[in-house]
Amino acid sequence: MKATLYENINVNKSMIDINNEILNYWKENHIDENIIKSNRNLKPFAFLEGPPTANGRPHVGHLMTRAVKDTVMRYKYMTGHDILRRTGGWDCHGLPVELEAEKHFGFKNKKDIENFGIEKFNQYCRDSVFRYIDEWNIVDDLVGFWVDKENSYITLKNDYMESEWWALKTLYENNLLVKDYKIVPYCPRCGTSLSSHEVAQGYKNVDDPSVFVKFAEKGRKNRYFIAWTTTPWTLPSNEFLVVNPDMDYSLIESDGFEYYLLSSKVESLFNDYKLIKTFKGRDLEGIEYEQLMPFLEKPENAFRVVAASFVTAEDGTGIVHAAPAFGADDFEIGKRFSVEILNPVDQDGRFNEKLPWSGLFVTDANKSIINYLKENNLLFKAETMKHDYPFCYRCGTRLLYYPLDTWFIKVSLIRKKLLENNEKINWVPDYLKNGRFGNFLEEAKDWALSRDRYWGTPLPIWRCNKNHYLAIGSRDDLLKYGGYIPEDLHRPYIDDVVLKCPECGSEMHRESYVIDTWFDSGSASYAAMHYPFSKDFTKSHFPVDFITEAIDQTRGWFYTLHVVASLLFDENAYKNVVSISHILDENGQKMSKSKGNFIAAIDFLNDYGADAARMFFFTGAPWNSKSVNKKLIGEITRKNLSTLLNVYSFFASNANIDEYRFTEIKEPENLLDRWMLSRLNTTIIKVRENMDNYNIHTALRYIEDLISELSNVYLRLSRKRFWEGNLDDSKERAYSTLYYTLRETIKMMAPITPFFSEYLYQKLSPGMPSVHMESYPEAIERFIDNDLENEMEHAIEIMELSRRTRQELNIKGRQPVKEILIYSDIKLRDDIIDIISPELNAESIRFIKSDEMPLKITVRADISKVAKLLKSRINDFNLYLERNNDLVYRELKSKGKINFDGIYLTDDMFIMNEEVNGNYGFNKDERSGIYLFINREIDNDLLLEGYAREIIRRIQVMRKDLNLEYSEKIKTYIDADEDIRSAVERYMEKIKNETLSSEILFKNDPEARAWDIDDKTVYIKIVK
């Protein structure tokens, strides 16, 4: 009995079963821990996990980010790196968590929370953030995401928040954290301000009023300024009209009224008018006008025209209505003239009792306000328009721009530093650096940090009644200034800590705010390691080498990490960042629970398995959106994973028969071996280059091409070497090439398909406990033969053209044909032609010249393209073309252009029709210029040979079904019509040799299997 050196496998084993088997293997053998130990103290590579919140289920988009992260880390392990900071992370604070809690309790506003109790509310928030942590951990295991979950950083922990306190104290002491009363984006539903990067994530394209309003000039009857606004609800708070000092304005008369507006807008608003005078905007400055609505007080210095450069000619009339209570630019004008701010809107976004529309939400009052303007002859024109407007990115409420006391981080002061540090970052894709991300940095706004909410990192600022402020940077600082350290630093416990003012000795109470949760995640670079309190933080840990998340994090985590690191360390937070786009449903729609198209990560993995899912994520660039495509995922499995299972099975079955065991790669002598090893090593170079540059999708494409060439070219053309004869030197070199190529391919795939690669690696009698402990393949340069690769590429194209042409002619591959003609500019060496000849399966294969091609070619000019060049000579050219069609064709094919009496015409100016002559079918490859012609005539001799080949194929299938070893002899019984009998008799020896049949008998046996061969029924039985 021969020893089984390589385990025979079930090639139909499901990918799910493979995943589960390998997951158990890793756990039982502590592979993850062993990799960490074996790579300790090697070249450091720091990773930082973008922290999700575990109060929601992981979806298929999360799988993609985890696939990218894990692929990069596995690759770095295999290329000799010690991965630092490979811990998970959990984002625990903020509005998303609070809104879920409010929904659970049925709360409508902040008053409900305070009546319920901050302590109980926050306790629910704390408990809820880990609601789905078990599912997250299961998904991470199933997808193969190797991170240290036990030591994950968690933003709600005291150590983490203490590091943030240190950072905020540092910013405060450097005058970068300041309190100011100014206009901020404000969510009336959540009752808190938002930062500019949060606002950027919530824009919607909506229909809003477009209103042209008449403001009466003071002391001048029937003279008005026409101002434009999309927020009529702000008109009761109007205090100024703003013009651009350098633009041209006109005073015109129409229908007995006079109007001021931008000169360039007159024609669009008036059909019939008389120009009175033109002005520069600065000439209008200081003109007073009547208060538009007499419901609010009349502040001193208000109701006048002022000039400012922010006014543009793009929309409206060039005259902007300014309400300092509701716009940042307006607010600055109000400050310039020291006016009292008119704010009739409460923090729920409703008008107060000073206006007739008391109790209405501001935008709900728009129609009533427009009606008021119409009734009082103050409305010039009212329309609607579509434009982008910000909504709360968490609850979906329309944001207001509202005046509040807010703590700001002065990001605007470090814009130059942000841009300089951005230059140090490798962005993938690179256009984000100076595009979406760089543009955002150029306009970086001061960060509205404080939130008038409950569940978050408390702002570490205390204030006494004399308005002295104190920033706390650690728990010890609480003791230093006369307080105590609560067990939990969250609200409400921290609110009870009273300190002693170091300036005046009076009591200090904490500013009641929490901070923007984006500061939490943006602090992960240092706070995850409890810097500066922990001594574990080193230069190797910062900046981190690699991060990746979805594209929207250019306005989120990527941005806040960058800002915080630039503020605190004058450094970029990360060196390499891969931005990932979204996974869409099968119809290209964004997935959500409300639409019913949400795909849970665990369901996706249970349907397809981790390796097929991971390969699917890399079918295109990760930064391009992709739709879930069941057919594509099935093709990925069949073309790559199933193919490799079959390649391994072929190797193992034959190697076990021949008792072959791989020891080392042998120098290739056979042309196919040389080509296969050249392709392998060329691929290794390309794959490493792309993996090093985070282009995983491109690396995978090269691997997929190699798998196809290994199976469909090398094995297909080499089968007989494995089936025939004893284990001689040539056969041993074939085994060596096949084993080595298969093993190195599996190792290349390992970071992308970790389970599948481990499965096949273990079957190949490995040298390491895990494929992931192997070194990543390195190219053996001496095996690379570029000329041979180029020639074989053309040979493969010829085989593909033959396959396509046969398909179109309905001639099977096993049916020999009379003649194949090939036209190609590249001459193939004879030994390559000999190799591909059996695949072409023709009695005669001839390489021909262009004028020998059985084609009728007509070339005609595309008049739309040549007329301008030929002009009056176009008739002469058409006559020339008619007489010299073949010559023109050859010139265009060889040179890409022709010269007609000094006029150069290129091949894209012509239309070429090719009609095949006689009994030929043909195909061509546009890229290489190869033409292939097949003679479609099949005479009786060819037909019989084709039948014989079909019989051989059926017997081989039956041998495989019986699990016969390749050396086992059989006896074959056949029953068929005269044509098939004639074919068997003529090719008896060939059939015997190729099927290992010791005897072939014509006999009708009731146990015979029926086969269909070209509409003929053939009965075959084989016995050992």
From Swiss-Prot:
Its EC number is 6.1.1.5. The keyword Zinc applies. Keywords: Aminoacyl-tRNA synthetase, ATP-binding, Cytoplasm, Ligase, Metal-binding, Nucleotide-binding, Protein biosynthesis, Zinc. GO terms for cellular component: cytoplasm. ATP binds at K593. It is found in: Cytoplasm. NCBIfam families: ileS. This is Isoleucine--tRNA ligase.
